[in-house]
């Protein structure tokens, strides 16, 4: 106004909520719709998450394979398990993965070379550790770190799990398809973090 006073164009009253700006239907919609979406996403992810975090004692992948009888995992996909199906195996093999700045090391234990073999390969013009596994088998990797926190990411398999100094963590490696891919560290672990990689081969 001309005398410098601002008129109360919205007819607001001190201490009174402006009800004419309220929209109950809209508020219910933006509360209920995201809630239902979260419930749906939880439902469709439950089976694969339960599968990849399966117990090593009689879970989806049975018990540890009998090495003396050269037992195979016989990994297969059960379409009738859960909404989207799940991987299962008669048994599994165990391996060990150790991380330290800035290299991975693999221990196949008593497994035959056909089931698991470690060595070196070339990636980005450098010699890097290499792990070779046999397709059609399930592996349970026991992992630890000798120094700082690392996070091995099996790129093609889409699995990742942190490894911590002084602790042992596990991850299931389901070797289904014949392929080659990288194992990368996805937790910053120092100056050469970007070069901490290994080659992984799944062979027939």
Could you say what each language-model-derived stretch is?
Residues 2-204:
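Non-transmembrane, membrane-proximal soluble domains of secreted or membrane proteins
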């Amino acid at each position: 106004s001309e005398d410098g006073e601002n008129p109360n164009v919205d007819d607001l009253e001190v201490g009174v909520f402006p009800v004419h700006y309220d929209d109950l239907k809209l508020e219910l919609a933006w509360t209920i719709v995201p809630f239902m979406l979260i419930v749906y996403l939880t439902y469709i992810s439950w089976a694969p998450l339960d599968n990849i975090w399966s117990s090593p004692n009689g879970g989806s992948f049975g018990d540890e394979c009998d090495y003396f009888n050269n037992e195979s995992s016989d990994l297969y996909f059960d379409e009738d398990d859960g909404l989207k199906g799940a991987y299962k195996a008669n048994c599994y093999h165990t391996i060990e993965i150790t991380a330290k700045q800035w290299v991975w090391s693999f221990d196949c234990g008593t497994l035959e070379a056909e089931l698991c073999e470690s060595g070196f390969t070339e990636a980005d013009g450098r010699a890097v550790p290499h792990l070779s596994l046999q397709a059609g088998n399930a592996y349970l990797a026991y992992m630890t770190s000798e120094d700082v926190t690392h996070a091995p990411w099996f790129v093609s398999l889409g699995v990742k799990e942190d490894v911590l100094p002084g602790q042992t963590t596990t991850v299931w490696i389901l070797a289904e398809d014949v392929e080659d891919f990288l194992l990368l560290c996805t937790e910053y672990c120092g100056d050469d973090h970007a070069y901490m990689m290994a080659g992984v081969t799944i062979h027939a």
